[in-house]
Amino acid sequence: MSRFFRGDSSSESSSDEEEDLYSDDEEVQEQPEEESEEDDSEEDDDDDDSDSSSDDGVGKKTGANAFLKDDSDSDSESSGDEGVKVVKSAKNKRFEELEATAKAIENGEKINDWGSISAEFDKLNRQVAKLLQSGTTPKVYIKALAELEDFMNETLAKQKVTPKKMNATNSRGLNAVKQKLKKTSKEHQKDIDSFRADKDAYMESEDEEVVAPKPKKAKSSAAAQNLVIDGDDDEGWGTVGKGGRTLQFTPESILKHLRTILESRGKKNTDRNEQIKIMEKLYEVAATPYQRIRVLLTLISTRFDMTTGTQTFMSQEQWKAAEKEFATLLSVVETNREFVVVETAEPWEDDEKLPTVADGEKFKIPGSIVSFVERLDDELTRSLQHIDPHTAEYIERLSDESDLYNNIVRTMLYQEEISKDESLTEPQRSLNRVVMRRLEHVYFKPSAVIKILDENCWKAIPAELDSTITPRGSVQDAKTLVNILCNYLYINTEGEGLTKARAMLCQIYFEALHDNYYKARDMMLMSHLQETINSFDVHSQILFNRTLVQVGLCAFRAGLVYEAQTTLQEICGSGRQKELLAQGVMIQRYNQVTPDQERLEKQRQLPFHMHINLELLECVYLTCSMLLEIPLFAQTGSSPDIKKRIISKTYRRMLEYHERQIFTGPPENTRDHVMQASKALAQGEWKKATDYIHSIKIWELMSKPEEIKAMLSAQIQEEGLRTYLFTYAPYYDTLSVNRLSSMFELPDRKVAAIVSKMISHEELAAALDQVNSSIIFRKGVELSRLQSLALSLSDKASGLIESNERTLETRTQGTANAFERQGGRGGRGGNRGGRGGNRGGRGGISNAPRQAGGTQFTGGALGAAVGSRA
C-alpha cells in the first residue's frame, strides 16, 4: 500500500513512515517480492516497537515479534527470507565510498600513477568533509593519509637518487599531492602519530564507529516535528535549532544568544541568513535600549559579513536593510544619551544581568558608528561599479545616495556630541573621517545639486539635532559648505597629512569646477602636493590626477590655452587617461599585469557618475596643442636658428599620421575634426579651421558652449595671424596693418598689439610703423630655402659623424691608442688631424697615405668631395 493512503495516525506509524522516507533517500536496495508479501511486511512494520528501531537495519527482516506469531505465519516468514530489504544509512554509504576511494589510492600507489592518486585524494577529502560534520575523523582516512605520506616520501627519495625523471603528468600529480598532503597532515597530525605508534590497536574500534544508528536518526526527526508543533503552540517567540531543539527568545536570553552568534562569527558552515532572522526576532523582544543597541550592532555587522568576497557586492535589498537598521541605531542612541557607542569601550561580560547606569553617567558600548557608515558608503560604491551605467537600475541605485548622505550627516552630528564629552576620550580622528566622507560626496557636484541635497538632508534630520560645524540654516550655498568642511579638516588634522591633502584636493577640484581658475591654481601651487604625491596611496594619487585635469579644463574655459595645454600634458600625453583617472583599465595591458593587480585596479575604479568625459578631455587637449603647435611649425620652418622644441609629441604623431594618408575623407570623429582644422590653419585658412572646430559636437557638454566657441574663434584668428606672419614674412618688404585686419577680421589695435608682441619677443624681424600703420620687415635675417636645406644637411652630417664616433668608441673600449691613426692622423683639433689643423683635419693638407679598412670614419662620399675641392 502506498504510504500516502495509510489511515494509522499513531506515533509508531509516523516513525515508520519517516523510516520509509529515509530509506528511499538513502537508495533502498531490495529484491522483488510479491505484492501480498509487501503488504504483510508493511502491516508488520506498523506493529513494530521502538526497540527494533535501534538496530542498524542492514540485512534484517522486518515483521512482528516472533513470540506473537502463530503457525500460519511460518510460510510468510520463509517466503519473506527470499526478498529481504537491504537498507544502507547515509553514514554507512559514505564510509563505503571512503573505503573505495582509499582502495583506489592504494591501487594508484602500486602502479606509481600520481595523476590518479591526486584526483582520488581530492575526492577523498571531499568525502571526509561530510563525515567530519557528524562525528570524529574516520580511521580509514587517517590510515590513508599516513600510508600516502610514507609512499610520497619514498618516491621523493627515489627521485633524488634515480636520474630518470617522471613524465609531466606524474610530476604535476606528485607536486599537487605534496602540497595538499602537507596542509592536511598538519590538521590530523595527532591521529596520524597514534596510527603509526600502534596500527592494530588504533584500527580496532573502527567497526563500531562505522555503524550509524539510522532509526535513532529517524526518531530524532519525529521528535523534531513534535518540538516544532510545541513551539508553534507556545505564545512566546521560538525557532527550531539543530537537533530539533526549540530556541526561546526572551529579553533575559538576548545577551546569551548574541554571545553565541559572536562566537560563531568567521567560522565555516555558519548560516548567516539564519543568524539574521534570529537577531531580527531578538530585536522585536528587546525591552531596554541597551539590548536594542547590542542587537543592532551585531545585526548590522552580520549583514556586512555576508559580502566578504572581493568580486561580490552587497545586494540592494541587503544594503537597504542595513541602511534602515543603521538609521534605527542612530535614532536609539540619539534618544538614549546615557548609552554611547565608542571604539575604546570595554565589552560587557555578564550575560545574566543588564548594566545599570546612574543619573548623569554614561555607559560605553563597544562599537564604531563611523565604520558602519563608511562600510555602507563603500558597499554602495562597489554596487555602482558593477552595474551597467546605461540602465535604469544604475539610476535607481544612485538614488540611494541621498539616504546615505543623510546618515553621514547624522553620524557627524553624533560624533560631534561625543567629542564634546572629554570623559569619553573619543579620538578626533573619528570625527575627521566622517567629515571627510561628507566632503567626498559633494566636492564633484555642481552647486545647485549640492544645495538641494543639503536642504533635503536637514529636512530628514530631527529638528532637535544640530551641528556646530555646519549649523542648520547657516549654509546658504555649496561654496560655503565646502569651505567650512575643508577649513575644519585643515585645523583639526594634526598628524594626518593624508586627510589634509585630500581635503585640499577636494577644494581645488570644487573651485576649478566652478571656474575659479586663479584660486585653484594658486592653491595647487602653494600646497606643493606635486612634490609629495608619489608617496601617497593610490586613491589619493587618483584624486590628484582628477584635480589636475579639472584645473586644466578650467583654464581652457577661461581662454588660457597655454596654461590648459601644459596642465593637461602630463595626463593626456601619456596615453593612459583611463588608468590615471580610474575610469577603466587599458585592454592592451592585460597581459602585462597579474590577475591580482588587475583585480585591484578594477576595485579602484570610480562610479560612472563621477567620471570626467575622456572624449571632451582629448578634444580640449588636441585643440590647445593645435593652437600652440601650428604657429611653432611655421616659426621653425622660416627660422632654423631657433632651437626646435616639441610642445606635444602626441599631437605631432597624430598630425604626421594624418598627413601621410593619401586620401582623406570628411572628418568623422573629434580627432579628425582637429586634424583637418590644423591642416587648414597651417595653410592660413582660419575660417575653414573655425568651421571644423565649431562642428565638433562635444562642446555641447560644457556649461556655456556658445561662449566656448566664441573664445575658440578668437584664438584661431590670432594664431592664424601669427602663422601667416611666420610663413610669409620673407616674401614681404612692408605689409599694411589694415590688410592684415581685413584678412583675419580683427581690429587694427588687436593686430598691432599682436605684431608688437611678436617683435618684442624677437619672434619677428620687423618694425612697426605706427605713422603709416604698416610693418617693415628686415631683410637678410631670414634664410632662403636653399640655405635652410644646406643647414639641414650639415646638421645631419655632423650627427652621423658623432654617431660613428660613439660606435667606434664602444667597439674599442679598453684598447690603447684606439684613436691614434697611422701617419699622424688623430682626433679633432690641435696640430694633428683636428678641424682646421695642419695635418689631416677638415680642409687641412696631409701627405700621409690613407689606410684601408673600416677604422677611418671620416671621408666617404662627403670627404672625397671636400678633398677634391681642396
Curated annotation (Swiss-Prot):
What GO CC terms are in its UniProt record? Answer: cytoplasmic stress granule; eukaryotic 43S preinitiation complex; eukaryotic 48S preinitiation complex; eukaryotic translation initiation factor 3 complex; eukaryotic translation initiation factor 3 complex, eIF3e; eukaryotic translation initiation factor 3 complex, eIF3m; multi-eIF complex
Subcellular compartments: Cytoplasm
- Give the family this protein belongs to, as stated in its UniProt record: Belongs to the eIF-3 subunit C family.
Q: What is this protein called?
A: Eukaryotic translation initiation factor 3 subunit C
Compositionally biased tracts (Acidic residues): 14-54
Checking Pfam families in the record gives: eIF-3c_N (PF05470), PCI (PF01399)
Q: Where is the composition biased (Gly residues)?
A: 824-844
Instruction: Please verify whether the record's keywords include Cytoplasm.
Output: yes
- Superkingdom classification of source: Eukaryota
What function does the entry list?
Component of the eukaryotic translation initiation factor 3 (eIF-3) complex, which is involved in protein synthesis of a specialized repertoire of mRNAs and, together with other initiation factors, stimulates binding of mRNA and methionyl-tRNAi to the 40S ribosome. The eIF-3 complex specifically targets and initiates translation of a subset of mRNAs involved in cell proliferation.
Can you name the source organism?
Answer: Sclerotinia sclerotiorum (strain ATCC 18683 / 1980 / Ss-1)
Residues forming the PCI domain are: 608-782
Using the UniProt record, give the first listed, main subcellular location: cytoplasm
Keywords (alphabetical) are:
Cytoplasm, Initiation factor, Protein biosynthesis
Q: What PROSITE patterns does the record tag this protein with?
A: PCI
| Region ranges (Disordered) | 1-92, 807-870
User: Subunit arrangement?
Assistant: Component of the eukaryotic translation initiation factor 3 (eIF-3) complex.
Task: Give the InterPro entries listed for this entry.
Answer: EIF3C, EIF3C_N_dom, PCI_dom, WH-like_DNA-bd_sf, WH_DNA-bd_sf
Q: Which GO terms describe its biological process?
A: formation of cytoplasmic translation initiation complex; translational initiation
Q: Name one GO molecular function term.
A: translation initiation factor activity
